[in-house]
């Protein structure tokens, strides 16, 4: 229904004093000048100044009303629709208004002597106000709204909406009882200007729509004008007003007007004036309005003015601080400009453009002969362009950044490579155990470089499961070759601009990763490790895999073009090393340009060596444990590897070893194994404090033990520290440090039952064993069939169907009278059921499982097999020979069956991997049948 008038000018606009000053015209009054500046009133509209008065006494209202009525009687008919400051007759007298419209004021109460613009949204209320003016009774009651306990105070929009919905008794209950009789100064549209006259108190409701109430006119309690306390309080209010005048210019005109003419108003008016112009909240202002005791009202106003004074001081402090900061910066800027001008006149310093040009020329001068001609030409052109541009233009910054990149690249600057094969071998062996094929390839690269006298860039892809050392071996290769190392990961990369750079036309454009690499390392022949190349993304910004073709192709990277530089760069000397977990995810055109080296993972023996020679030393040093303080047995390491860390790599093994040494460190500290020397302090004072504390502790120990000599307790303390027992970690107490075993034996059966055969599988995490289980569901004539479970993929399901067919064929050949497959419904399962599985290499294992069930004969002990089978019984080659061999060794399998076509792959394995294994290579399933079920004949 009502909305408080708001303005960005100041809070004075909400409540503005309208007092007349005796002896001065309204136009010349300083207060009226302030009002005209704030509200926009001018000399042509001075009628409001004539009728804007304090009306706490009845005679004031009568005299002013009669004078104004006579002055503007001829213009009264059109005043409503024109100026908001039109003269309005004020008959009857204010004290005669005992029944008034109740207007809610939402934000601050209206004080006598002040005006307040409000917006009336209710048509009925607006019509009633206009009717009151026409009946020459332009008065209404302005009452502050109480807080709505059910509304969110932080939402002003919701609060105004709730006000508009209030009607009748509901609105009456939300109004404060004490308000102000307000004269309706003007109505223009839905804007109403109210001028406060005197205090009112609501007696009862007369009508609901619009809300009309009976009121009592309130008068101030009698008081002694000569009371010293009242005088002192009033003068303190005036003094505070003067202080506010010094700190805040917002109220300067108002305070000056009222303090200069102190005799023109009374103490009650002074209290109202101070409370009205303060920034007090609505409840504090309402408390002043309701107070009829003049002395108490002055005290309340004084408290509010003191708070206002404190706020003004804080504002002044903040303003001064900001002004000083800005002034200091401006002064510094002017002095710098003057200094530049003086240096330029003396020839000591050139301008910014000349300095930039000199800096860029100085950069390229040492390698000017090595810079390609086309690049040098572009640099010269851009330097000339830079001199013609204004320093404040955006093109100047673009050109400056472009020249900065062009001149900082290492054109023709190559690091001295190491062609010493023996030294390279030593470095590679220091950092990594095993990985002989990778080391051999790097040594071949060095040998070729030594024979040619120079080296060429190559693209090597290290493929293997996580944690086998693909990334770390790239760093070791760089150290062995004496090349700079740079790594960037392309996992999830979906923007071509990350590789090829952005065009310079874009805001914030930057070169690609390769150019950033050259700037970072400072040489043109670094070793660049492109990590996770099998996890490239593809999005709306292009295909990064296609962008890498130009980067990695030896035929193209000699003229690699970055979009930002727009000049070709020679990357033919760069050695690229890529890493991937699965090469199947790498696009074929990209894979074709790489030399793939597979890192299958580590066998148990290799993991033990790595843990003992590398991981344990690093963890011990990181935890501050001395070698003589702990001993980890080989059995503990073996148990840790087999029961906690079965993955192909050693990353998890490193975490577990670090966990063990952290617990050992905690145990040593609790048992008192502290270092002999004091802890290193961050500053000398702290070091002295530590020394004093240590000395006091030693002295305290001497007193307790009643030792006469000062040297004996120190020796005893040292003896106690050294005498702590060495922590022993073995298989029996390993669980106390790393918890319960995570893995259990993959070999589930000592003697595999009928229908169960162990196969070998390969995953991105390495090799593993895989059981194939088959059982009879139902028997009966003509009920033959096969159910398959185990979350198998399409390829593996087809392998099961092929295995069922081949098994029936073999059974028909060997035992024609056996009708097992024709009359038995079978169920083939591959545990574990929660693990997805796919691939053709389990074909021979499935056939063996079916035949074991048909012949009711288990396969031989310690046998595992792998191989794809055709319908004719031929065994096709498989992948992951090393991983599967490692998995078989881990499960203590001694006999393995591989396809004949994989014999060469097995022969290439290291001797420690092949040691102790009885491997059979077959090309037809008939041989597998003899190996699996003919063990009785072999034993005979």
UniProtKB/Swiss-Prot annotation:
Keywords: ATP-binding, DNA-binding, Hydrolase, Mitochondrion, Nucleotide-binding, Phosphoprotein, Protease, Serine protease, Transit peptide. Residues 100-309 form the Lon N-terminal domain. The active site is at 841, 884. GO terms for biological process: cellular response to oxidative stress; chaperone-mediated protein complex assembly; mitochondrion organization; oxidation-dependent protein catabolic process; protein quality control for misfolded or incompletely synthesized proteins. It comes from the Eukaryota. One of its GO terms (cellular component) is mitochondrial matrix. Residues 751-935 form the Lon proteolytic domain. The keyword Transmembrane does not apply. It catalyses: Hydrolysis of proteins in presence of ATP. Signal peptide: none annotated. It is found in: Mitochondrion matrix. ATP binds at residues 464-471. Residues 70-90 are annotated as: Disordered. It is an enzyme of class 3 (hydrolase). Pfam families: AAA, Lon_C, Lon_lid, LON_substr_bdg. CDD domains: RecA-like_Lon. Residues 1-61 form a transit peptide. SMART domains: AAA, LON. Homohexamer or homoheptamer. Organized in a ring with a central cavity. Belongs to the peptidase S16 family. ATP-dependent serine protease that mediates the selective degradation of misfolded, unassembled or oxidatively damaged polypeptides as well as certain short-lived regulatory proteins in the mitochondrial matrix. May also have a chaperone function in the assembly of inner membrane protein complexes. Participates in the regulation of mitochondrial gene expression and in the maintenance of the integrity of the mitochondrial genome. Binds to mitochondrial DNA in a site-specific manner. This is Lon protease homolog 1, mitochondrial. The lineage of its organism: Eukaryota, Viridiplantae, Streptophyta, Embryophyta, Tracheophyta.
């Amino acid at each position: 229904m009502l909305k408080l008038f708001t303005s960005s000018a100041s809070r004075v606009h909400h409540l503005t004093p309208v007092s007349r000053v005796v002896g001065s015209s309204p136009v010349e009054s300083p207060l009226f000048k302030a009002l005209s500046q704030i509200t926009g009133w001018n000399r042509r509209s001075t009628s409001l100044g004539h009728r804007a008065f304090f009306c706490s006494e009845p005679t004031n209202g009568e005299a002013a009303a009669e004078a104004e009525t006579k002055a503007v009687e001829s213009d009264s008919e059109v005043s409503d629709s024109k100026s908001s400051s039109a003269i309005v007759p004020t008959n009857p007298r204010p004290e005669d208004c005992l029944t008034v419209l109740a207007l809610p004021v939402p934000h601050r109460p209206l004080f006598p002597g002040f005006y307040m613009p409000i917006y009336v949204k209710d048509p009925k209320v607006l019509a009633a106000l206009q009717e009151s003016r026409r009946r020459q009774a332009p008065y209404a009651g302005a009452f502050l709204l109480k807080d709505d306990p059910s509304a969110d105070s932080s939402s002003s929009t919701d609060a105004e909406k709730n006000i508009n919905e209030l009607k009748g008794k509901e609105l009456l209950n939300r109004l404060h009882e004490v308000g102000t009789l307000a004269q309706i100064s003007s109505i223009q549209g839905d804007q109403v200007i109210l001028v406060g006259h005197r205090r009112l108190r609501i007696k009862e409701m007369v009508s609901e729509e619009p809300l009309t109430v009976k009121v009592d006119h309130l008068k101030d309690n009698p008081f002694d004008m000569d009371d010293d306390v009242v005088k002192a309080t009033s003068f303190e209010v005036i003094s505070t007003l003067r202080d506010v005048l010094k700190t805040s210019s917002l109220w300067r005109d108002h305070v000056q007007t009222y303090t200069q003419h102190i005799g023109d108003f009374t103490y009650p008016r002074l209290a109202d004036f101070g409370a009205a112009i303060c920034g007090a909240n609505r409840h504090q202002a309402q408390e002043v309005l309701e107070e009829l005791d003049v002395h108490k009202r002055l005290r309340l106003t004084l408290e509010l003015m003191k708070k206002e004074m404190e706020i003004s001081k804080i504002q002044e402090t903040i303003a001064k601080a900001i002004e000083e900061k800005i002034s200091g910066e401006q002064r510094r800027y002017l002095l710098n400009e003057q200094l530049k001008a003086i240096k330029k006149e003396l020839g000591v310093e050139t301008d910014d453009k000349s300095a930039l040009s000199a800096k860029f020329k100085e950069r390229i001068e040492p390698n000017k002969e090595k810079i390609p001609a086309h690049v040098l030409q572009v640099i010269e052109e851009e330097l000339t362009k830079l001199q013609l541009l204004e320093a404040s233009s955006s093109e100047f910054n673009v050109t400056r950044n472009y020249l900065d990149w062009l001149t900082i690249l290492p054109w023709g600057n190559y690091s001295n490579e190491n062609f010493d094969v023996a030294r390279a071998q030593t470095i590679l062996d220091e950092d990594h155990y095993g990985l002989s094929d990778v080391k051999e390839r790097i040594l071949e690269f060095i040998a070729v470089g030594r024979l040619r006298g120079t080296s060429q860039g190559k693209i090597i892809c290290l493929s293997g499961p996580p944690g086998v050392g693909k990334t770390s071996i790239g760093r070791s290769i760089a150290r062995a070759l004496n090349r700079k190392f740079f790594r960037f990961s392309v996992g999830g990369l979906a923007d071509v601009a990350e590789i090829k750079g952005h065009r310079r036309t874009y805001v914030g454009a930057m070169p690609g990763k390769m150019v950033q690499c050259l700037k970072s390392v400072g040489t043109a022949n670094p070793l660049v490790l492109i990590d996770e190349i099998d996890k490239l993304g593809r999005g709306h910004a292009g295909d990064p895999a296609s962008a890498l073709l130009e980067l990695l192709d030896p035929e193209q990277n000699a003229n690699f073009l970055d979009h930002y530089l727009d000049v070709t760069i020679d990357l033919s000397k760069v050695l690229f090393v890529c890493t991937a977990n699965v090469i199947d995810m790498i696009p074929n055109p990209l894979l074709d340009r790489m030399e793939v080296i597979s890192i299958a993972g580590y066998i148990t023996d290799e993991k033990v060596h790595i843990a003992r020679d590398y991981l344990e030393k690093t963890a011990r040093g990181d935890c501050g444990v001395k070698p003589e303080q702990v001993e980890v047995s080989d059995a503990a390491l073996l148990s840790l590897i087999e029961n906690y860390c079965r993955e192909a790599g050693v990353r998890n093994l490193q975490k577990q070893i670090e966990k063990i040494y952290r617990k050992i460190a905690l145990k040593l500290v609790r048992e008192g194994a502290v270092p002999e020397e004091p802890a290193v302090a961050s500053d000398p004072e702290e070091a002295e404090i530590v020394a004093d504390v240590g000395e006091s502790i030693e002295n305290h120990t001497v007193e307790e033990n009643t030792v006469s000599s000062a040297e004996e307790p120190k020796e005893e303390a040292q003896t106690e520290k050294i005498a702590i027992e060495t922590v022993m970690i073995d298989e029996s107490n390993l669980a106390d440090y790393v918890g319960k075993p995570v893995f259990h034996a993959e070999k589930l059966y000592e003697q595999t039952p009928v229908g169960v055969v162990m196969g070998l599988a390969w995953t991105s995490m390495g090799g593993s064993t895989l059981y194939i289980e088959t059982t009879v569901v139902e028997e009966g004539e003509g009920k033959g069939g096969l159910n398959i479970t185990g979350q198998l993929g399409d390829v593996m399901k087809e392998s099961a169907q092929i295995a069922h067919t081949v098994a029936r064929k073999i059974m028909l050949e060997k035992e024609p009278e056996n009708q097992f497959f024709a009359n038995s419904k079978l169920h083939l399962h591959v545990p574990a059921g929660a693990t997805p599985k796919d691939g053709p290499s389990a074909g021979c294992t499935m056939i063996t499982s079916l035949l074991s069930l048909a012949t009711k004969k288990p396969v031989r002990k310690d046998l595992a097999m792998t191989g794809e089978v055709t319908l004719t019984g031929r065994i096709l080659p498989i992948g992951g020979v090393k991983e599967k061999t490692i998995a078989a060794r881990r499960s203590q399998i001694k006999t393995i069956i591989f396809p004949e076509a994989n014999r060469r792959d097995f022969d290439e394995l290291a001797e420690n991997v092949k040691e102790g294994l009885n491997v059979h290579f077959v090309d037809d399933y008939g041989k597998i049948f003899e190996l699996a079920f003919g063990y009785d004949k072999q034993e005979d």
